[in-house]
Amino acid sequence: MEAMKIRNLYNLEETIAAPLLEQYEYPWEVLPYIKEFIKALGNALPEDRFEKRGEDIWVAKSATVAPTACLNGPCIVDEEAEIRHCAFVRGSAIIGKGAVVGNSTELKNVILSNKVQVPHYNYVGDSILGYKAHMGAGSITSNVKSDKTLVVVKSAEENIETGLKKFGAMLGDCVEV
């Protein structure tokens, strides 16, 4: 499972969530803590670069948010990010520098590293996407098993029980879907 460890999947210099990710070995271990991390980090963001736009919603002044986009907190939209028409951020979302969240894309409990693109008709839930990861049109990170049992991550070497009912995907840096 060495390949699935945070240190091997993600360049932590490319996410504002590095202090959270550094505390854990595997990406799924981070998911239950995204919400509280955002709240703590948001209150510490520099006011000259970020503005608070509602309860637990911080948006970089250099970011672009379409008037038809819906942002629910807690969330952080980092610098130069673009939130396009009808994007829906349900909460517990970190949107990295230069990231694109497009038309009819929904986010829930996610970390999008810098320059991630989820540009149209995507669902990204309970997931972590690495630097420059890109999800093509209509791709989703299904986050609940059809039998509603806990998610097990499997490899040739071993199986690891995550203890989670909801776990979408862990896309490493520069992954294309």
Q: Can you annotate each of these PLM segments?
A:
Residues 177:
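Switch/coupling sub-region of P-loop NTPases
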Residues 42, 69-78, 82-174:
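Flexible, glycine/small-residue-enriched loop-and-beta-strand segment within the central core
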